[in-house]
């Protein structure tokens, strides 16, 4: 019944987790109030969560046959830092409790320890000092002086909505095809949706997403995971900017065509320069990478696949090297040309303030524009009829 829930293990786990986050948030707020270096707090918070995660993964219920401290530490570090590297086979080593610990570490790492703890501090403890709010505003790349809490809510809201939508589509794509019951399918869908959006690349399948259970006739699964990786890799400021633009355009169209009032909302351009650069560069890298990989691997690594599967695998393998660690084809089966292309894609990475790595597409775009300006002898670096500041160019170089 209802009251029995308060005596269940799940209730105690959730309660202890919330209390731990509140205590950590309170500690971070006190440190910020002392003008402590936010970068030092950021690094220390990651280290604390890594050590806690490693300790939890060594618990008897987290694994089937036990795990060494080095393997637990490596797995926890990889999960928090969303790299996707593992020293043990995830599917045969960790129990459902262990997988839950891993996915929570991935979620914390994907959102950012500081983002998560700052949200708890502001939401449950009220407004903090102006200095603390400015630090948080800078941390989440908010351009306005409105409450950082609203920006943090945007980030958490976007994360939950996108991951829930991804979970639903993944569930539909695998339902009744992998020999799992409903609970296992839901757990599989939730794990891979979070892992994809956070760009972690962890999978519960042996051999990652190259497992024979999903390699063929699961194009929707690969496409869904690819788009989750892309959304997580473009960065939260881009997602917020896109939301604001879509919200504005929806209101404008509503007033114009439903209320027949053309003067109510004036049309303006809300896409900022950063959003345009990231979206255009992402599209260029995806299209170029997909076409190149399909051409290189048509009769090589993709031999035996249908035409549709080849293009889906090309898109998937052009998406994941930049930001995530998923794999659907063994790396040893790829041609040298594809491996070199993947090295370049990994180096470029995703957008700033995202879950992706690399030098970032923003930086890569500025470097290329600066190089072009030098080659043609231009005094200024322009893009979309706007001049890039010398400070932006200096930091990118």
Language model features: what each stretch is:
Residues 1-397:
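Membrane-proximal intracellular helices of multi-pass ion channels
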